[in-house]
């Protein structure tokens, strides 16, 4: 099998996006369009990925700093052929070269594998698609069924404009052939640009075979030149993700109101209500229920967990049979054990909460360790920050913390301790101790409240 190199064209400015971002950095499912294409190239086990860039070079390089690509600069954008000419010096003669577009993010590995398999030994294969409205696309010109040319919209005559089979721009041939044809391109056309479409005519002139594979799903090859098209690609992508999850057994209450911006691994009988967003890598156990409006990013969630509406989790783990929300926030480093209860307006950050413990209302637990079977009342705060440094609070097992308690870290609360409501804890508490620190309550009989002056 020949080696494979992929060339991704990503030099365009994207004027119709009306944005400072290069077009290919606009996102589908939370990921830049060009990153989708790079990931597909990786799935094909490409030996090299050449990224043609121009506009927004610094932004592209910063967003894609970790990607294994060969950066190829295109100073002037003089057409697709000109872009490929910049990459040609890197082509090995005996390798396959696959040309892709950074603003067509939904192209699939399976379609590209079919295209590569269809490439003649001595020839070129291109990906086409039939469109009801082919306006703006290069038309496929055939003679006796064989592809002989591609004519761009602005260069097509009246008869050619009636053709509905169009060029997607995706093609594959060997490096030696591409280099030969690229050297013979000219810009004698209405746009004054160098078209890769002219390569098909040159291949025919040289007696090379031209194969064509038609994409079965036209959305796979759609690009995004403006935000309307970008939104259409987003909705289509989300529709396909929702469809797949439903067929795998996940109950999406309304598939049209669910967004997956990463990967979701799931067990059986999971149920996800409307307007839930999944980001990054999320793993659900069996029978997990997620209420409306939740946002969950990079989390692992155990069996039989119930997440009530409008909760936001990031980089957290949740044990089996836990109940969380509504309106709860788990920040990075939150680790909840089995059968924990986290209630409304509770925030947990870089903290562990032991099995069976309850933090039910209006509480902040940060940089802390909470043992098993504890109860933290409403308004409890772990005061973990002195303006410069973070400190840890350690709470043992079976500890009761009353409402409106401040735990000023660093502080340790031993097993079985009880802390009365309104207490400010600044010293360690021993095992089974009761701690109360309150201003003595005063009663003033006959007190007259101040009155407003009229």
Swiss-Prot record:
Residues binding UDP-N-acetyl-alpha-D-glucosamine are 9-12, 23, 74, 79-80, 101-103, 138, 152, 167, 225, 331, 349, 364, 375
Q: Which InterPro entries match?
A: Bifunctional_GlmU (IPR005882), GlmU-like (IPR050065), GlmU_C_LbH (IPR038009), Hexapep (IPR001451), Hexapep_transf_CS (IPR018357), MobA-like_NTP_Trfase (IPR025877), Nucleotide-diphossugar_trans (IPR029044), Trimer_LpxA-like_sf (IPR011004)
The UniProt catalytic activity note for this protein reads: alpha-D-glucosamine 1-phosphate + acetyl-CoA = N-acetyl-alpha-D-glucosamine 1-phosphate + CoA + H(+); N-acetyl-alpha-D-glucosamine 1-phosphate + UTP + H(+) = UDP-N-acetyl-alpha-D-glucosamine + diphosphate
- What Pfam families does this protein's entry cite? Hexapep, NTP_transf_3
Top enzyme category: transferase
Entry binding sites for Mg(2+)? 103, 225
Keyword Methyltransferase part of the UniProt annotation: no
Q: Name one GO cellular component term.
A: cytoplasm
**Gene3D superfamilies, A to Z:** Hexapeptide repeat proteins, Spore Coat Polysaccharide Biosynthesis Protein SpsA, Chain A
Q: What ranges does the record give for the region Linker, renumbered to this chain? A: 228-248
CDD domains in alphabetical order: GT2_GlmU_N_bac, LbH_GlmU_C
Q: Where is this region: N-acetyltransferase?
A: 249-454
Q: Where in the cell is it found?
A: Cytoplasm
Entry keyword set: Acyltransferase, Cell shape, Cell wall biogenesis/degradation, Cytoplasm, Magnesium, Metal-binding, Multifunctional enzyme, Nucleotidyltransferase, Peptidoglycan synthesis, Repeat, Transferase
The record's similarity note reads: In the N-terminal section; belongs to the N-acetylglucosamine-1-phosphate uridyltransferase family. In the C-terminal section; belongs to the transferase hexapeptide repeat family.
As for what it does, the entry says: Catalyzes the last two sequential reactions in the de novo biosynthetic pathway for UDP-N-acetylglucosamine (UDP-GlcNAc). The C-terminal domain catalyzes the transfer of acetyl group from acetyl coenzyme A to glucosamine-1-phosphate (GlcN-1-P) to produce N-acetylglucosamine-1-phosphate (GlcNAc-1-P), which is converted into UDP-GlcNAc by the transfer of uridine 5-monophosphate (from uridine 5-triphosphate), a reaction catalyzed by the N-terminal domain.
Q: What name does this protein carry?
A: Bifunctional protein GlmU
């Amino acid at each position: 099998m020949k080696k494979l190199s992929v060339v991704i064209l990503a030099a365009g400015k994207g004027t119709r996006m009306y944005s400072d971002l290069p077009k290919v950095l606009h996102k589908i499912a939370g990921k830049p369009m060009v990153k989708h294409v790079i990931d597909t190239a990786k799935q094909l086990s490409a030996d090299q990925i050449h990224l043609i860039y121009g506009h927004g070079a610094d932004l592209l390089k910063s967003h894609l700093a970790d990607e294994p690509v060969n950066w190829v600069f295109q100073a002037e954008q003089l057409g697709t052929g000109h872009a490929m000419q910049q990459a040609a010096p890197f082509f090995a003669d005996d390798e396959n070269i696959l040309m892709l577009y950074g603003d067509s993010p939904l192209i699939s590995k399976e379609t590209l594998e079919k295209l590569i398999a269809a490439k003649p030994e001595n020839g070129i294969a291109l990906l086409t698609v039939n469109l009801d409205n082919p306006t703006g696309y290069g038309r496929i010109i055939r003679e006796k069924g064989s592809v002989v040319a591609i004519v761009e919209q602005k260069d097509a005559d009246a008869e050619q404009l009636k053709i509905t089979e169009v060029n997607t721009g995706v093609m594959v041939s060997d490096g030696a052939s591409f280099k030969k044809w690229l050297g013979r391109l000219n810009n004698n056309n209405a746009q004054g640009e160098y078209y890769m479409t002219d390569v098909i005519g040159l291949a025919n002139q040289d007696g090379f075979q031209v194969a064509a594979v038609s994409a079965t799903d036209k959305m796979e090859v759609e690009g995004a030149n403006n935000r309307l098209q970008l939104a259409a690609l987003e909705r289509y992508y989300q529709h396909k993700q929702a469809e797949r999850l439903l067929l795998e057994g996940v109950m999406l209450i309304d598939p049209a109101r669910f967004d997956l911006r990463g990967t979701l691994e799931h067990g059986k009988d999971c149920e996800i209500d409307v307007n839930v967003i999944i980001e990054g890598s999320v793993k659900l156990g069996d029978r997990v229920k997620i209420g409306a409006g939740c946002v969950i990013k990079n989390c692992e969630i155990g069996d039989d967990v119930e997440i009530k509406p409008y909760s936001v989790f990031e980089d957290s783990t949740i044990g089996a049979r836990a109940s969380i929300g509504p309106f709860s926030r788990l920040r990075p480093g939150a680790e909840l054990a089995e059968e924990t209860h986290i209630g409304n307006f509770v925030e947990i950050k870089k903290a562990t909460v032991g099995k069976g413990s309850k933090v039910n209302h209006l509480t902040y637990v940060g940089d802390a360790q909470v043992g098993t079977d504890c109860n933290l009342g409403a308004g409890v705060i772990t005061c973990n920050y002195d303006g410069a440094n973070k400190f840890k609070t350690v709470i043992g097992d079976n500890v009761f913390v009353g409402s409106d308690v401040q735990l000023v870290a660093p502080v340790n609360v031993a097993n079985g301790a009880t802390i009365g409501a309104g207490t400010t804890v600044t010293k360690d508490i021993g095992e089974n101790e009761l701690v109360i620190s309150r201003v003595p309550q005063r009663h003033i009989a006959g007190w007259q409240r101040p009155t407003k002056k009229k």
